[in-house]
Amino acid sequence: MFKFLKTTGLVAAGLLVGMAGIAMAEDTIVVSMKGPGAGNPFWAAVQRGAEERGAELGVKVIVLAPPTESDVAAQIAQIEDQLAKGVKGIVLAPTDPNALAPVVDEAIADGVPVVFVDTKGTNAGVTYIGTDNKAGAALAAGLICDRLPEGSDVAILQGIVTQSTGKARADGAHDGLTACGMNIVAEQTGEWDRAKGLAVMENILTGNPNLKAVFASNDNMGLGAIEALKSADMLDQVFVVGFDANPDAATSVLADEMSATIAQNPYNMGALGVESVLTLMRGGTLAAVIDTGTVVVDKSNAADFQ
């Protein structure tokens, strides 16, 4: 599951030398994810990375998430509650970067360091740890361009485009597909959700019987799209590329259903998030961006991601 190499990250780079030994029991770091790990392998991997690295460094890690990735108010309330309880550092994947900006400012003003993972925030000077999502989506678009002739009908299943992650993936796919002459017939959001991805794909197929490829901004939506394509008896004519390389998607690739997916490194997002905020808690500094990388997953390597 998510078999990217588990880097020792900042420790390997020498940026946390001696810190594990001085981390104190009362140090508490909150990891606020956009969605719960249960039912979503991506967030489960983020949580595992954060908790395991926290244990290695001797800090308490509390992992929280709103009920859904669109429940902005719940995430804000969770963070405000933890600030009131005296949390020492925050690792944040914001559901809505603009809406979360005030509570991030509040934390920083109170001396509580914050880093962003997975999704960039809007607060100046806060480090982002995660994927270059636009480049990753462009990589996915390139797979489609290499497979299909110019002018082919293609579609994009977007995530939540008010989030920087959703916008970057939508933009990267759009720009890449446009550049190679694909005919983008639909760009619709499935809000990162499998059931919504299925419903949106059904709607797209109704008006586009000659569809040849779809880029799904995450694997959940891609797997939903595959269900719709199966029901329409069109899976054999549509090239499906996802994003995240979660275990279900890897299995789908091996079954010749999903054609490929783009792997992130969610484990390292969680682990490096904890390491990085601990660096700030100890008075250290960070780079503005820490890129956790991407790789194409197809039948040649999908077994490594199950």
Model-identified regions with their sequence ranges:
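A residue-level marker of the well-folded mature domains of exported/periplasmic proteins
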Residues: 3-6, 21-306
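Bacterial N-terminal signal peptides
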Residues: 9-20
